[in-house]
Amino acid sequence: MEPSGSKKGRAEEPREEVECQMSSQPSTSSAKTKATGKKQRKSEKDDGCKPEEKSAQDPETPGHARRKVPVPPFPQHLPPVNLIHRDVLRAWCQEMKLSSKGQKLDAYKRLLARAFPDQMPELKNVPDSAKEARLKMPRKKMKTEPGEESQVTVPLEIVTVPEEQIPALVDPPVLYEEVSTTVVTTSASEAVLASWARIAANAKKLEAVPSNATSETYGSTGEMWCVVHGTSLPATSSGWVRLQFHAGQAWVPDKKGKAIALFLLPACTFPPPHLEDNMLCPKCVHKNKILTKSLEG
């Protein structure tokens, strides 16, 4: 027979093992409570139950109140519908004991027929749509963003002034008088350059001239006047030519009935009465040929 102490020890061992297993496993009661909490939240969402929000506004920040339009006294002549505010039109209808219900156009027509029968011919000028009957506001600023403003402009009506009211200009302004009396003067050298500028435009142009254009002429005194040098030179040397003028330009006669444009600037001096003033010396003829070749090359 086994002693009683050993039996008690064996009985206590399985109890300790069961307690250890129970402590290692999670408690089902806590899991149940968590599951029930989730179900409650889902049921609140399904039912649309939300926490109460403060519907009342803060007393320090009052709500936006509608601006009250001042009602003017009843007029003797009814203005157009687009110049009357809706609230003003309703107040006038109530003053005349008329119905102010419906659209703005309907109330305007009722008031026009009841209180202003003399203006009934103007009924054809009343707009047909409610959009055209809206109140026309003057220029105002609409705030789009903080710090930025956008302006709404109303087109201005252009009024023509009768011709009788336009003042006539009797005396011209001082500025016009100064401009009209201004005279531009140029020196003699600038005038010569301007006159010969057209010749330079036809640098490569050759023109046919009569054969008798290249005739040498000797003065009775043995001197000839060169237009480029601006002085009289001995006429004994050969090669003097007479300048030909055609189409407002001076030409130097050349061989075979041709002519070359004159590029040398003439002197601003006049010859004596007994000398011809359209002759060119041989040196100037040679210089003009060289200048023409350089321009062509």
Swiss-Prot record:
Its main location: nucleus. The modification Phosphoserine is found at residue 211. InterPro entries: Dppa2/4, Dppa2/4_C_dom, Dppa2/4_central_dom. The keyword Nucleus applies. It is found in: Nucleus. Signal peptide: none annotated. Keywords: Developmental protein, Nucleus, Phosphoprotein, Transcription, Transcription regulation. Residues 43-63 have a biased composition (Basic and acidic residues). Residues 1-77 are annotated as: Disordered. Residues 23-34 have a biased composition (Low complexity). GO terms for biological process: lung-associated mesenchyme development; system development. One of its GO terms (cellular component) is nucleus. GO terms for molecular function: chromatin binding. Interacts with DPPA2. Interacts with PCGF1. PANTHER family: DCR DOMAIN-CONTAINING PROTEIN (PTHR16073), DEVELOPMENTAL PLURIPOTENCY-ASSOCIATED PROTEIN 4 (PTHR16073:SF8). May be involved in the maintenance of active epigenetic status of target genes. May inhibit differentiation of embryonic stem (ES) cells into a primitive ectoderm lineage. This is Developmental pluripotency-associated protein 4.
